[in-house]
Amino acid sequence: MATVVLGGDTMGPERIFPNQTEELGPHQGPTEGTGDWSSEEPEEEQEETGAGPAGYSYQPLNQDPEQEEVELAPVGDGEDVVADIQDRIQALGLHLPDPPVESEDEDEQGATALNNHSSIPMDPEHVELVKRTMAGISLPAPGVPAWARELSDAQWEDVVQKALQARQAAPAWK
């Protein structure tokens, strides 16, 4: 790589940003009074426990060695598994929604019309078509949670039936 010589001076990074050991000529030296980059006083470092620029501060995590550890219960059979799964479903907010509140003022015809209004009328042929179509649908393996893979269809139906019965037996508080 060739160096271009202009007026006896070489141009390169060492000339643009000279180091402290080189002498600066009169046209290259800093003017008086501009020794610092800014006229402001150097900023003081913030204390470790002090608030940051947005008002946030460091909050240390609990380091106690006597922390409670969660023990996983061994997987049981039947009702234990169903109860455990029901608890998980409720904790995740995946439980069935509350049934609509029934008014005592409604007459039977109005209630029947309301129930029929929310359902789609289908003949038995159409019902079978929907069942076959839904049976052909499969979710990808990562889309199915581990607890759902552990349940058989019969166990899942039992969970749903128990949840429905519990809702029907529970008094309407709302």
UniProtKB/Swiss-Prot annotation:
GO biological process, one term: cell differentiation
Tissues expressing the protein: Highly expressed in testis. Transcripts can be found in primary and secondary spermatocytes, and spermatids, but the protein itself is only detected in spermatids. No expression in Leydig cells, spermatogonia, or sperm. Very weak expression in the heart, kidney, spleen, thymus and ovary.
Biased composition (Acidic residues): 38-48, 65-78
Keyword match Phosphoprotein: yes
Keyword line: Developmental protein, Differentiation, Phosphoprotein, Spermatogenesis
Pfam families: MEA1
Residues that bear Phosphoserine: 103
Region (Disordered): 1-78, 94-122
UniProt key word Cell cycle: no
Domain of life: Eukaryota
Cited function: May play an important role in spermatogenesis and/or testis development.
Protein name: Male-enhanced antigen 1
Natural source organism: Bos taurus
